A protein has these predicted regions:
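Accessory carbohydrate-binding/adhesion or oligomerization-edge regions at the termini
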Residues: 1-75, 155-197
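Extracellular and analogous surface-interaction loops
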Residues: 90-92, 96-108, 144-149, 203-204, ...
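Aromatic-lined ligand-binding clefts that engage carbohydrates, nucleic acids, or primary amines
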Residues: 102, 106-120, 154
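Beta-strand-rich ligand-recognition modules
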Residues: 119-171
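Ser/Thr/Asn(+Pro)-rich, low-complexity disordered segments
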Residues: 192-405, 437-444, 536-814
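Extracellular polysaccharide-recognition and catalytic grooves
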Residues: 357-578
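Short structured motifs
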Residues: 81-84, 95-97, 138-143, 199, ...
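Extracellular beta-rich ligand/substrate-recognition surface
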Residues: 83-93, 131-135
Length: 814
């Protein structure tokens, strides 16, 4: 029977998993403070029922949860991670089982890591527990496992509250006796098959147009190019799988950036996803002669692309169709069953799916522009009157109200819905339409006041700026003139910031919130906005948010293309952040200061007693707790903040993060590439950026990693602790205090890791204009003579100096 060694840093990496078991969850408790309310729900959701007899734990058989046991495989991961997004609230159970084998009786110290509530059993004995789930940061519990000679069943019973992005994650780290322990799985008959399938998948190498393996593919091996569909109608179509049994290489089609390889051996199924970085390229909409379309022509092309998608996919379960319907109405396009889609959408709004405010905002735009009669009119009225427009109104759901984009969505929806039905009574709000209109109007004004004074918290987010754009143009189009004018000015500011950070073919920017698209500046959602402004740029679908613009009178401001194209070296503030940007013909370097110069951050009101929870200031404070702070300081727990980039264009970019997850599976914030588990110290000056990453013992991931897609550069040189990069006339150099080691996960030849909890990086930028040649640049970069003192945590490079002093931010514990 196959056995495995412990993984990186002593983590157990081979498990069987049952679940998640998902049940509708309802709690009669009420609290107008949603922060306190969800904390309460997490405190009571875990039942901690004794596991009792587990029975035989076999792949394909049912567990005590009445869910099948599966062998868990996630290439490179140190955790079981079955995180996902829940649009409605759920009670979650999942069980994890593994076998630890030893030749003698030993007491082993282990660390349990999880966001869930977890009971840990060793041979049926409860050894320790995490009592309740948390949102963030991850919990750690040290415990003793009393192992007997032979096989020891380790059983983790996990419980969680499923609400929005839910971290169903657990890991077990062995802290001593590591060399005396081997790992297996309870299903002895499946262990050998699992080892064969896993060894085959782990041997994979992406080489040009083929995927190569060290051995022939086992029976039951197949592959597909299917990964993600923007159109929910297409997402429902089964993937096409191609047989690969007996092959030791798979020839891959051009234009297919994703390939998933699956091995099925009996009831055992393992998958690994590969991303072919070089196959992900900018998409242009140009005339046959290569010239750009006019603004008006390009705008129509944008609307056509959105109209051709039936419904924007929100995963495998449902789609959001309103942007697509709005685009089709622009063309008077009746080719799809939009009446059915509208009724399905109204049901989602009525059930108050998370993000149903997006649908409501689009519905309001629809009603302002297109007539509705009969049963549809009455159905819409009923849904709108009975909607929950804010978290202190009656109702139980898992909607996110408080992020910068969601808050404005809800505020403007309340303002507009109340105005549409002034004499109707809105029972959840306990207001008439006139009262709800004034309520929403007041909140919109508070939101505008805040952004005008402080700037955006979700600054430069290439995901959420698209959402905020849609909400803002609703305010522009459907508000009284003074409010409309202010909303237009804020929209102008948002687009100006994005234009300022548009470099050659992509948006290169630090961001308040980001997702995995951070790897591809040319393919980020907000490039849809930049392509609208400048048709010469690559386009993206941008989740179809520009469907709202098809019926808007908001004018794009002048001068944005010039902002994109001009050289600049500047810094500015937004939220609590100070952003640095330097861009020229050769390179772009941008970051947030961490820490920034002494200043007074805005006060988080959730930390105060007897605070007025009805104000937008409280909502903004609430958002900082959930979605991460813009008060960047070393040692602070991160969320979705992206802190720096160096780029030679929208494809050839690099950055370093401390990952929040050890693999790309599961819906994690922070993730493997987006966000940071713990924030570094950062300092930028002309052509130079230094970073110090110190990982505390309270965080389970003990390395940092560099994203460096070598296929995007014309020349790549590895030399001791340096990597030198050239593309056309631009040059980058990256130094690390640790020896960098290549790692291939979902992408190949894109990642370098520093296996240290205390490491420094120096990025040097240059180009032909300042350095004449690449060789001259290399010499100049080396002459900075970077040095890092681990004890004092100080990085020096000629006149450059940066020190690390760890900070703790109480707002980031939830």
């Amino acid at each position: 029977m196959s056995r495995w060694k412990l993984g990186l840093d002593g983590f157990v990496t081979h498990f069987m998993v049952s679940g998640p078991q998902e049940e509708p969850y309802f709690n009669e408790a009420k609290d107008k403070n949603q922060l306190r309310y969800e904390a309460y729900l997490r405190s009571v959701i875990a039942e901690h029922k004794p596991v009792g007899e587990t029975g035989e734990i076999l792949v394909g058989e049912k567990s005590r949860l009445n869910e099948e046991w599966k062998y868990y495989y996630d290439s490179g991961s140190c955790f079981v991670n079955i995180s996902t997004f829940y649009s409605v609230m759920r009670r979650i159970h999942f069980d994890i089982a593994t076998m630890l084998e030893t030749s003698s009786d030993i007491d082993v110290t282990a660390a349990l890591w999880s966001y869930a509530a977890v009971d840990v059993y060793c041979n049926g004995r409860l050894e320790g527990a995490l009592k309740q789930p948390v949102y963030k940061p991850i919990q750690k519990k040290e415990l003793t496992l009393h192992l007997k000679a032979g096989r020891n069943l380790i059983y983790l019973a996990c419980e969680n509250l499923g609400v929005r992005d839910t971290r169903s994650v657990a890991g077990l780290q062995i802290l001593n006796h590591k060399d005396e322990i081997k790992v297996s799985i309870p299903d002895e008959a499946c262990a050998d098959a699992a080892a064969v399938a896993e060894a085959f998948l782990e041997s994979a190498r992406l080489e040009s147009n083929k995927l190569c393996f060290d051995s022939s593919a086992p029976a039951g091996t197949s592959y597909t190019y299917r990964y993600h569909e923007e159109d929910f109608a297409k997402a429902k179509i089964p993937a096409v799988w191609y047989q690969a049994e007996g092959k030791n290489e798979i020839l891959l089609e051009n234009g297919q950036p994703y390939v998933t390889v699956k091995v099925v051996l009996g009831k055992l199924e393992l998958k690994r996803v590969f991303e072919r970085t070089e196959q992900l390229v900018p998409k242009y909409a140009l005339r046959e002669d290569g010239s750009a379309f006019s603004f008006e022509e390009n705008k129509e092309l944008i609307f056509r692309r959105i109209a051709d998608v039936m419904s924007e996919s929100r995963g495998e379960k449902f789609g959001f169709p309103i942007s697509n319907i709005l685009a089709r109405k622009h063309f008077n396009d009746n080719s799809m069953d939009d009446e059915r889609l509208m009724y399905e959408m109204l049901e989602m709004i009525e059930e108050r799916y998370d993000c149903s405010d997006f649908l409501m905002c689009g519905l309001i735009r629809y009603l302002h522009n297109y007539p509705v009669e009969g049963a549809m009119k009455e159905r819409i009225k009923d849904v709108m009157i009975n909607y929950r427009y804010w978290m202190d109104m009656d109702g139980f759901d898992g909607m996110c109200f408080w992020s910068e984009n969601h808050a404005l969505m809800f505020y403007t929806c309340a303002m507009n819905a109340g105005e549409m039905y002034p004499d109707e009574y809105f029972p959840r709000a306990k207001m008439t339409g006139r009262e709800l209109h004034l309520y929403g109007r007041n909140k919109v004004l508070q939101w505008l006041d805040d952004v005008e004074e402080y700037g955006f918290e979700e600054f430069l987010s290439t995901v959420y700026m698209c959402v905020t754009f849609a909400a803002l143009i609703n305010v522009v189009d459907y508000s009284e003139p003074e409010i409309s004018k202010r909303a237009a000015a804020v929209t102008d500011k948002m687009l100006s910031m994005l234009a300022l950070h548009t470099y050659k073919t992509g948006i290169v920017a630090p961001m308040g919130r980001v997702y995995r698209s951070v790897l591809y500046p040319f393919d980020q959602g907000a490039m849809a906005l930049m392509n609208l402004i400048n048709p010469k740029l690559p386009y993206t679908f941008g989740e179809g948010w520009l469907g709202f613009y098809a019926s808007s009178h908001y004018p794009i401001p002048e001068g944005l293309v010039k902002l994109m194209e001009d050289d600049v070296e500047t810094n500015y503030t937004t939220g609590n952040a100070r952003v640095y940007l330097e861009k020229n013909d050769d390179y772009c370097l941008t970051s947030v200061a961490s820490p920034r110069e002494p200043f007074t951050r805005w006060e988080n009101e959730t930390l105060k007693e007897d605070v007025d929870i009805t104000t937008h200031n409280f909502t903004k404070s609430f958002n900082e707790r959930f979605h991460g702070t813009t008060y960047f300081r070393p040692g602070t727990y991160g969320y979705q903040q992206h802190m720096w980039y160096a780029a030679l264009d929208g494809e050839a970019s690099i950055f370093v993060t401390h990952p929040g997850s050890t693999s790309e599976e599961g819906d994690m914030r922070p993730g493997y590439w987006h966000g940071n588990g713990v924030m570094p110290a950062l300092k930028q000056q002309h052509g130079l950026l230094g970073g110090i990453y110190v990982i505390p013992d309270e965080h389970p991931i003990g390395y940092t990693h560099l994203y460096c897609p070598e296929c995007r550069f014309d020349e790549v040189i590895h030399e001791e602790n340096w990597i030198f990069l050239r593309k056309e006339t631009g040059y980058l150099a990256l130094w690390c205090s640790e020896k960098l080691e290549a790692h291939n996960g979902m992408n190949f030849n894109c990642e370098q890791r520093a296996y240290s909890k205390n490491a420094a990086y120096l990025c040097v930028c240059g180009g032909k204009k300042s350095d004449v040649s690449f060789a001259t640049f290399k010499k100049r970069a080396k002459e900075t003579s970077p040095s890092y003192d681990k004890e004092s945590k100080t990085l020096t490079a000629q006149e450059f100096e940066l020190s690390y002093a760890a900070c703790k931010d109480v707002t980031q514990f939830l």
